């Protein structure tokens, strides 16, 4: 869980726009389809992340599946809060990871990067 000092709309905006204000330093560019239900992130390390949104209930729920190389997974975020504070609860299920990869740590790093952009 993470908490941000801003409205859910702002958190939603950044989570669905990986290149907005260069907030995610690992993403070099992204292609977003017209409906916003499919994103292909081109990462600075040369890999791509293919994201398909299953559910976008703005601004309260995001649900997607993703593929990055041999790694596949599902991500769900539920945003709770009001105009000046948002609590974000996430679940992350990952397949295809090596023994030493820690998905929870990666998720925490992602949420911390988002916190730096949005404020505490």
For the regions a protein language model found, what residue spans apply to each?
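Hydrophobic ligand-binding cavity/cleft-lining segments
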Residues: 1-31
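Generic structural detector for well-ordered beta-strands
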Residues: 1-5, 52, 78
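Glycine-centered loop/turn positions within well-structured domains
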Residues: 9, 60, 86
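Short, intrinsically disordered, mixed-charge
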Residues: 13-20, 58, 108-112, 116-119
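Glycine-rich portal/gate segments that line the openings of hydrophobic small-molecule binding cavities
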Residues: 19-70, 74
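Beta-strand/loop substructures that line and gate deep hydrophobic ligand-binding cavities in soluble
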Residues: 63-120
